Amino acid sequence: MKIRIGTRKSKLALWQANYVKDFLEKHWGVEVELVKITTTGDKITDVPLAKIGGKGLFVKEIEKALLEGSIDLAVHSLKDVPMVIPKGLKLGAITKRENPYDVLISRSGKKLYELPSGSVIGTSSLRRQVQIKKRRRDLKVEVLRGNVDTRMRKLKEGLYDAVILAYAGVKRMGYESEITEVLEDFIPAVGQGSLAIEIREGDKRIEELIKPLNNEESFLCAIAERTFLRRLEGGCQVPVGAFAKIENGTLKMKAFISDIEAERYIEGYREGNPEEAEKLGLSLAEELLKKGGEEILKEIYSSQ
């Protein structure tokens, strides 16, 4: 019996879906077909995601196909998956995380702190924008949408002096050698670097097939980060970030909430037992909300 994987049509999405397809074929000897689906986020390419609003812009149509039974599983970038999974579906596996950080690629080869004042930086994410402003208020941040190839082309055409992208996407699309700097002090997007495999609840057969793809450490980090973001009701339209990693048996997590201009930037840190990932994520969210995050979020949501 053929297994159908639902995926977006972009080059990066197909790389991700093929990664899962190759595994299933080699490991289990099953036949796998990719079903390419256009999502709302793919159709709207000229408007910042924060302006469109709404969650699940890159997954809704794929989830619908999964619920209807026209596909057997879906492969997403974990960072695109909304915090609340539709009834009847669940995350069956989260793959081993690629390098989770953001990277800077500049035309001049200069790092973030070396770029001349007034340099134009392209990024689509509010999370990245506020972290740039916090460090270099003298740089000009401009919205940049599109896939990795499109963003790299715009950089090379001179529309931007530098762009900030996720390391994972840059590597998967073959641009790793062009990285100027890995921004390890930037807090990445929730789930950045991992793939999420979404399945129907109760579909034991598919669940067994994808089980070996699940990475327990990445799964626990994802729970901590996603619990944090769910408490904040955050999506693409809010400047927040959370990052968890497990070192020597301890889950260490840092996160931030900021206003749009990075004038009020609230950070926090937690560490504890990885098995209490959900509790750690929730308590860090509560701490940041109490420290002024709640007020910031109210202002942002009311202005949208």
From Swiss-Prot:
State which Enzyme Commission number(s) the record gives. 2.5.1.61
Q: Known catalysed reaction(s)?
A: 4 porphobilinogen + H2O = hydroxymethylbilane + 4 NH4(+)
Q: Name one GO cellular component term.
A: cytoplasm
**Cofactors required:** dipyrromethane
Any binding details for the cofactor? Binds 1 dipyrromethane group covalently.
| Cited Pfam families | Porphobil_deam, Porphobil_deamC
Protein task = Tetrapolymerization of the monopyrrole PBG into the hydroxymethylbilane pre-uroporphyrinogen in several discrete steps.
Instruction: Fill in the misc note.
Output: The porphobilinogen subunits are added to the dipyrromethane group.
Protein name, entry field: Porphobilinogen deaminase
Organism of derivation: Aquifex aeolicus (strain VF5)
